[in-house]
Amino acid sequence: MPEGGVLTGPEIQRCIREGRISVTPFDEKYINPGSLDLTLGDTVALYRDTAVVSAGGFDLPFRTGTMDLTEEALRATTRQGGKNLTPYYAEMDSKKQHDVWKFDIDPKIGWLLRPGIGYLMHTAERVCTKEFVPVIDGKSSIGRLFVMVHVTAGYGDTGFDGQYTLEVLTTYPVRVYPGMRFCQMRFHTSVGDRLNYRAYGNYVDDASMGPVPSKSWKQFGT
């Protein structure tokens, strides 16, 4: 295989069969000519300081001082698939750890993406390769709804093992559903010695599952 190339769809499928790429769950119908489709997972996370939820006639920020959302508001948000969320602009500090609320997405209701809110979502598939460089990006069908699937950091690390967190923004209100084809992954061959992700990764955890919030605060030692 030439160095520095991008795997074709048939080569991705061959590498999965040979165990050089691990995708769980895997469906052959998601193989494209030059990429692999990945589907949307069933959990969404929002920073507590960036949205307002309406429940019982009241609008409550995810956090107001030390007051968290009531169970009623949490249940209402899940029941309505995020329809009761509106933007709430508070300062995000990259030196600080920010808490998130996580909601399960009902596959029948889906989740309504709203402009002005940043959503942490994730792939349903767990992906790992110790040989190739994975690159994740949106699908054109999702992009034409003016939904941005991955704001930045599209390159994955060789050796990473887990579901991929997606940084989702939308221009218009758009409802999305778990299990739908949401993004795609390409696999690049690498040139030179490979570094062990578990030894050199900046934010190494055990297998990453579900949406993971920013860990930028760790670089400041706080």
Locations of regions flagged by a protein language model:
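DUTPase catalytic domain/fold
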Residues: 1-222
